[in-house]
């Protein structure tokens, strides 16, 4: 619900929402966003960020929806966001929990947890795209919030970079799926790996494309295990003449 007496212009720049709310005594303002909702492997990561009063000065003008930026740019902005943040948190929801509750419920749960883990309860919460209740304070859903509200954009960066780092770490355990490349999202290469090896513990078994490969025959299981061992042993080895 839009707060009474607060005029928020979408053309006021990335910091327009925070400035308007703080002027009306509704600060500090937390932005919340997630990463990994559309993936079929790996966790969902939800972040909450409260920018400090000098956030506008300390943050690069490149701050925008993390999905529009390169991985290298996001990594640099991640450090900038943490320096500019008065408070922040990140919540990691594993694939098993997503399978139990569904990704939408997991997303809402993650948003509530992220706000609850902030050091101080915010005066207002801005969410990206859809309304969420249960923060213990007022909130507002902002359409395309990660492109128009700085605190949501900052949360998007924290969530995306945190999840990318997790997926790169998982790649060292499951090299055959190439998680470092596609980060658990559906690609032709990922689909081919699923068909060949079946899902691993980090795949979301409730997803249709994963479930299709979730119950291989005993013979196929044996072959896929051999493939995994071979892929792991050859990872990083370059054939020479």
UniProtKB/Swiss-Prot annotation:
CDD domains: RNase_HII_bacteria_HII_like. Belongs to the RNase HII family. One of its GO terms (molecular function) is RNA binding. Its main location: cytoplasm. Keywords: Cytoplasm, Endonuclease, Hydrolase, Manganese, Metal-binding, Nuclease. It is found in: Cytoplasm. Its EC number is 3.1.26.4. A divalent metal cation binds at residues 33-34, 128. This is Ribonuclease HII. Endonuclease that specifically degrades the RNA of RNA-DNA hybrids. Residues 27-227 form the RNase H type-2 domain.
